Amino acid sequence: MSLYGMMRTGVSGMNAQANRLSTVADNIANASTVGYKRAETQFSSLVLPSTAGQYNSGSVLTDVRYGISDQGGIRSTSSTTDLAIDGNGYFVVQGPGGSTYLTRAGSFVPDKNGDLVNSAGYYLLGAGADEAAGGLTVAGLNVVNVNAAALPAEGSTAGDFTVNLPSTDQAPAAGGYNHKTSLISYNDKGEKITLDVYFTKTGADEWNVSVKNAADGVEIGTTVLNFDPTTGDLVSGGNVAVNLGAYGGQTLNLNLGGSTQRAGDYTISQAVINGQAPSSIKGVDVGNDGAVVAVYENGTQKVLYRIPLANVASPDRMTVVSGNIFLPSAESGDVRLGFPQGDGMGKIMSGTLEESNADIAQELTDMIEAQRSYTANSKVFQTGFELMDVLVNLKR
C-alpha cells in the first residue's frame, strides 16, 4: 500500500464520518418536527485493483437514505384539523407555485381565506364529497376550504307529519279542538314561521285539520281526515297545502299519510319539515375515511370534501424537499391515489399529529460512534503524513 493511498483512504473515511455526523445533527435538530423522516448515512466500499505483492487501499462511499416509509409516533392535539395517518399513504399538498407534493406533516389550519394549510405553507388537497375512488387524479383535486360553504337560506316546501289520533276522543264544543302541535317552517329568507296544527274530531271517523300561523292566528291550510272504521287507517285527506306566500314563503305540502285513529294516546311518530335558516360553519370534523364534515351553527352537518391519500411503490426513493414534503421520482414509482381505509391506504386520525421518527437516544449513540470513527481515520491520515515525512528526510 502506498503512503499516498493510505492518506487518501484516511481522508475518505473522515469525509464519510463527517457526512454521518451531518445526518445525525439534522435528525437531532428535527426530533420535534411534525412529520419529519429520519436521515441515515449508508456506507459502501470502493476497492482498487491490487497485485499479489502490493495492496492498493481504496476508500468508502456514502449515500443518504431517508426513512420516509417508517411511521413516527402519534400524539393527540386539541385541533380537529390536525391530521395524522395511521398506516400507508401521504397527504397530497400544493405549494405556493401550484406544484403538488406528498407529506405526512398534517398540522393544518385555515388561513385567512379558509384554505387548510400546514405549518410549512403547503395547502391540503381534497376530492369532491361524491368523488369515486376509481376517478381520482392529482389534477382533479382542489384545495380544501372550510369557510366557503355556509348554508344558504331555504324556504320550506315539503314536510311529513304522522300522528295517532285516539279513537276514544269525543267531538269538542264549538270553537274547541282535541289536539295541537307546533311545527317550525321557514320562508325564503330563512326566517322562522311557527305553524300550529289543530286536530278537531267532527265525526266517528272524521277529523278536521287546521294549520295556522302562530304569530297572527291566520288559517293558511286545512284538510279533513277520514279513517277506516275497522282498521283505523287513513282513507283520505292526507295532504295539506299550507300557503306561506303572505309571509315570504312558498306553498308547503304537509303530508299526513300514515296517520291513524286507534286506541291509545295522541302520539307523534314523525314531524319533519324541510327548509333552513342561513347558517355559518361552527367547526370542522374529519373522519377516519377522510370525509371533511362541516358542523353548522344550527346543528346541521354536511360533507364538504373527501381527503384522498397517495402512495408510491418505493416511498424511500422519493426526493426530500424542505418543509417535510416529498417529490415522487422515477426510482420511487408513479403516484397512486385512494381513499383512507381502502385501496391499501391507512386511516386518517383527526386531532392527532405524527411525530418525527428520529430517536434521540439512537442519534446520540450514532454521534459517538461517528466521532470515534472520524478520530480513528484522522489518525490514519496523520500516521501516513508522518511516514511520508520520514521518507522525505531519508535524503538528509
Swiss-Prot record:
The keyword DNA repair does not apply. Coiled coil: none annotated. PROSITE patterns: FLAGELLA_BB_ROD. It is found in: Bacterial flagellum basal body. It comes from the Bacteria. GO terms for cellular component: bacterial-type flagellum basal body; bacterial-type flagellum hook; cytosol. The keyword Chloroplast does not apply. Keywords: Bacterial flagellum. Transmembrane segments: none annotated. Disulfide bonds: none annotated. Its main location: other. InterPro entries: Falgellar_hook_FlgE_sf, Flag_bb_rod_N, Flagellar_basal_body_rod_CS, Flagellar_FlgE/F/G, Flg_bb/hook_C_dom, FlgE/F/G-like, FlgE_D2, LlgE_F_G-like_D1. GO terms for biological process: bacterial-type flagellum-dependent swarming motility. Belongs to the flagella basal body rod proteins family. PANTHER family: FLAGELLAR HOOK PROTEIN FLGE, FLAGELLAR PROTEIN. This is Flagellar hook protein FlgE. The lineage of its organism: Bacteria, Pseudomonadati, Pseudomonadota, Alphaproteobacteria, Hyphomicrobiales. The gene is flgE.
